[in-house]
């Protein structure tokens, strides 16, 4: 693992179809000076049907707009809908392959 005891815990942020909540969460993270030294992984699940498509697209566009504001940001757009539990489980496992610790957030926290 590349992590060590002196690095900040990376953040795994899970999003789906709530762009307003996601914006609030991202803005809150940016208020913390430590975010410049923190890895931010954002996992976006794919929409299930056309009812969620527009909101999911807004989430993707918002993340693209915010990507330049974070120094260490990786956005993972799922190619198929995994569902909340699988998206979170797989995302956490992916982060733990690179780091020894993690902070988990959802877009509405």
What is the predicted function of each stretch?
Residues 1-105, 109:
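An acidic/histidine-cluster motif and surrounding catalytic segment
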